[in-house]
Amino acid sequence: MARHDPNPFADEEINPFANHTSVPPASNSYLKPLPPEPYDRGATVDIPLDSGNDLRAKEMELQAKENELKRKEQELKRREDAIARTGVVIEEKNWPEFFPLIHHDIPNEIPIHLQKIQYVAFTTLLGLVGCLLWNIVAVTVAWIKGEGPTIWLLSIIYFLAGVPGAYVLWYRPLYRATRTDSALKFGAFFFFYVFHIAFCGFAAVAPPVIFQGKSLTGFLPAIELLTTNAAVGIMYFIGAGFFCIETLLNIWVIQQVYAYFRGSGKAAEMKREATKSTLMRAL
């Protein structure tokens, strides 16, 4: 017969002092300690420590340099102000880069609408250099072939006088005219550029005026030399072609500059300035 349980919801009576289960014995395993970190007693860290006197000396040295820079800056500013008051512009030579001879900075100094004209004018200046150099070469060959040393000396004179003369007389006035928009500078350019065009046209033809025209590589001496020495005649024809191209570029430049000169009202301004200067001289 089954045992009767008076209260099925009552907790079971357990004797805490009774030995119900056996506890497994503890193992003999243990945690191994970490190895000690290496310690280098001889390792040192060098920390530069300046003495108070050294710091003061360096501070005084830096202060002296700063004062010197301020003094130089003030002196430079004073000179720039004095130059600005007198209207003198210092032009640093920067062209050509390998051996600067002139000041030339079209992108930064010439207005954008005049840069094309200025570049083509500069091309005509370089073109004149090339024409006169080729003229020296061709005339030298003609001299070797028996034409005499006089024409060679004249070709050297053309180059030595023509290149710097062109820069001083018409290219620099045009450069300054486009940079400052000066009517008088434009007038100087027009006056001397007309002579430049006339010389290039004369050289392209080279009529027998000076030593039968053989000191210049023009068409007329080229035709004459072609019958006696074909190589020299061809060189003269090439030189004549160079002078023709130079003349055409010169005509384009003076037309463009004159169109700007008239369109901007500089012609009337130039007349007023010329009249004013004439009256001042008369007074």
UniProtKB/Swiss-Prot annotation:
Key words of the record: Cell membrane, Coiled coil, Cytoplasmic vesicle, Membrane, Transmembrane, Transmembrane helix, Transport
Cysteines paired by S-S bonds: none
Region named Disordered: 1-47
Residue intervals passing through the bilayer: 124-144, 151-171, 186-206, 234-254
Topological category with respect to the lipid bilayer: Multi-pass membrane protein
Coiled coil regions, renumbered to chain: 50-87
Membrane topology, Cytoplasmic segments: 1-123, 255-283
Gene Ontology terms: cellular component: plasma membrane; transport vesicle membrane
Cell location: Cell membrane; Cytoplasmic vesicle, Secretory vesicle membrane
Biased composition (Polar residues): 18-30
InterPro entries: SCAMP
BP term (GO), one: protein transport
Pfam assignment, any one: SCAMP
Family: Belongs to the SCAMP family.
Functional summary from the UniProt entry: Probably involved in membrane trafficking.
Name recorded for this polypeptide: Secretory carrier-associated membrane protein 2
Gene symbol of the encoding locus: SCAMP2
